[in-house]
Amino acid sequence: MNGYVPTFRVVINDIRKSIASGQLKEGDKLPSLPELAQQYDCSIGTVRRAIEHLQITGELQGRQGKGTYVTGKLFEGS
């Protein structure tokens, strides 16, 4: 392997690190998808994939028309 990590995985790992370190706390709102895409220099679809993964694991919660929020729960799997 060459050590390549897909961008959506980088986003997932960064958000998880921010939650684990306390930089992001329960109830905190994440930046918008376009803002995150700009931050990671990737497409909105890539960021959406990462956010959806973190919603499935229960670490983030999307609120229609309001944004995406940290649940305070950290997934212990991969």
Q: Where is each model-derived feature located?
A:
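Extreme N-terminal segment that seeds HTH/winged-HTH DNA-binding domains in transcriptional regulators
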Residues: 1-44, 49-52, 56-61, 72-78
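A cytosolic small-molecule/anion-sensing beta-strand core signal
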Residues: 64
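Acidic, glycine-anchored pre-beta loop/turn
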Residues: 67-68
